[in-house]
């Protein structure tokens, strides 16, 4: 989905280079985390290897280059984490009150694309983005960044897909229609967010 997002936004992002003296306030960075799962037993030290490595690296890298009081984490306007996306009929709760405005935009974009007939096999009675809060904490790659104050929009279905962590957690159980619909919603969200 991230590669599809980058491909879909490529022309709009490249068009900014053609505008003289154009310095966009926002840019898009795609980060692929690896090593989320524990090797032995889930703990603070045996999990989230990729994000726990990147977080302090970004915190110690001045941004803009040469800055004394700001680092790459300060430049992160929003971390959008996508996880376990691809099973049919997912529902996404809003995990953090501070991300409600962005979650509400996803909810509104989904409804607008539905009204325009651009979402396949989609029902407003079963929307993907349902604005109810989640009552617990899920340990995932957003945690190191959240602890440092980076705003997070966490998109993981609740409940988790039935095939999660089973031998059936494979390509055969990805739902093409759901993925296509979510790609459209996320692309519209990113175009709006980046003012493109």
Model-derived features with residue positions:
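Acidic/histidine-rich catalytic neighborhood of metal-dependent amide-processing enzymes
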Residues: 1-105
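Active-site-adjacent substrate-binding region
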Residues: 78, 84-196
